Amino acid sequence: MNFYVEVLGCPKNEADCALLKSHLRKMGNNIVDNLSDADAVIIDTCGFILDAKKESIEEILSYVEYKKGKNLKVFVTGCLVQRFGKELKKEIPEVDGWFGVLPPKEIATHIGKRNVIPEVPEPVYNFEGRVDNGQYAYVKISDGCDRACSFCTIPLFKGSFKSRKIDDILKEIEFLIERKIKEIILVAQDTTGYGIDIYRKQMLPELLKRINDLSGDFWVRVMYMHPDHITDDIIEAFSYDKVLKYFDIPVQNGSDKILKLMNRSRKTRQLYSLFEKIRNFYSDAILRTSIIVGFPGETRKDFDETLKFIKEVKFDRLGAFIYSDEEEASSFSLSGKVPREIAEERLEELMDIQSQISFEKNEKLVGKKLKVLFDEEEDGVLIGRSYMDAPEIDANVFVRGEFKKGFFDVKITSADIYDLEGEIVEE
């Protein structure tokens, strides 16, 4: 059977589907890049917030419409199914199979035979091969979450925090290096908590050391670091040659009152100290964060505190989102809901400030050299990234030329608000 795989949602889904494709191939199937060549479609969904749910449902419905009059099967898997499986099966009976949060091998084994939506999510797995395109790959080191952020529903459909064994992760990374993958991106709900459940201590520093010891020309990026777990040992582990000094630390807000309502344990003064410590360790550290605006109870004063926080820290990269009022989240019962139009205005105001910070930082890069990895070519322009940018969520470096694999030194010739332009420095 020819399978076309559509991946929605976060990079953890990308990692899961890379393994799913490998298991499907081992069972005698083919993975196709064109929908017109497919006998079956697998849609891996996201069920985190309202916008993600809408996108997933719209995609499912579009494939259901597409398959009319065709000999095409549509299968749906992932977080949306784990969270709303019963309702989905009732509302969209045209789907040929539903699978919740399961190891990819389980999905490949049961697809076309029966639905599998486990009572207890099973988000981690053992490595047995994967299929990737491009020069970067996401590697899931753990999944699930034991925290209780009031706005978050992830523990409901991903379950408790579970780490993979370190040797299994290294086996997967060695597999990727052998296949010339140049950027290994470690993902989890909280990468800094890696190992606490199975080794009874934080193992991210040890994991980074052992990855760094592997031979090959590649670099390592760490995503989703919860500020509560960031120790000096973790910060020091970013000194390894192959580990990028890129710190993705979602703080969610800059008001102590709102942080308390979010059930986040760190106060802003502690967050300031953390970011100051990282920059004292590494003058070239890139700080990335995420901010939620419009949280219940957020007043103009609270929002101004967040703006002050952003202006003072001057994050290199920042993503901001409007609060999504999820019925199963404890924040759903909070009073003081912020009207959508006010939240949208605050989001725009915040991003205006961040764009100024970003442009000022980018201007300072003009004339300097950056090591760049190219992801694709479009109309004679190479689209790449330096150590400062993760795929899809951050900025790009644009260079005229034909696609090249590997790392290249690029001299920056001009700067935009977020993106850079440059030219390859010939040796």
Curated annotation (Swiss-Prot):
Entry's localization field: Cytoplasm
Gene, per the UniProt record: rimO
Domain Radical SAM core, residue spans: 131-360
Binding site for [4Fe-4S] cluster 1: C10, C46, C79
Keywords, comma-separated and alphabetical: 4Fe-4S, Cytoplasm, Iron, Iron-sulfur, Metal-binding, S-adenosyl-L-methionine, Transferase
Stated name of the protein: Ribosomal protein uS12 methylthiotransferase RimO
Domain MTTase N-terminal intervals: 1-116
Family: Belongs to the methylthiotransferase family. RimO subfamily.
Cofactor(s) listed in the protein's UniProt record: [4Fe-4S] cluster
InterPro entries linked to this entry: Elp3/MiaA/NifB-like_rSAM (IPR006638), Methylthiotransferase (IPR005839), Methylthiotransferase_CS (IPR020612), Methylthiotransferase_N (IPR013848), Methylthiotransferase_N_sf (IPR038135), NA-bd_OB-fold (IPR012340), Ribosomal_uS12_MeSTrfase_RimO (IPR005840), rSAM (IPR007197)
Binding site for [4Fe-4S] cluster 2: C145, C149, C152
Chain ranges of the TRAM domain: 363-426
Annotated GO CC locations: cytosol
EC number: 2.8.4.4
Pfam families from the UniProt entry: Radical_SAM (PF04055), TRAM_2 (PF18693), UPF0004 (PF00919)
Cofactor note: Binds 2 [4Fe-4S] clusters. One cluster is coordinated with 3 cysteines and an exchangeable S-adenosyl-L-methionine.
GO molecular function: 4 iron, 4 sulfur cluster binding; aspartic acid methylthiotransferase activity; metal ion binding; protein methylthiotransferase activity
Reactions this protein catalyses: L-aspartate(89)-[ribosomal protein uS12]-hydrogen + (sulfur carrier)-SH + AH2 + 2 S-adenosyl-L-methionine = 3-methylsulfanyl-L-aspartate(89)-[ribosomal protein uS12]-hydrogen + (sulfur carrier)-H + 5'-deoxyadenosine + L-methionine + A + S-adenosyl-L-homocysteine + 2 H(+)
Gene3D superfamilies in alphabetical order: Methylthiotransferase, N-terminal domain, Nucleic acid-binding proteins, tm_1862 like domain
Protein's organism: Thermosipho melanesiensis (strain DSM 12029 / CIP 104789 / BI429)
Species classification: Bacteria, Thermotogati, Thermotogota, Thermotogae, Thermotogales
Its biological purpose: Catalyzes the methylthiolation of an aspartic acid residue of ribosomal protein uS12.
GO biological process: tRNA modification
Keyword Transferase listed: yes
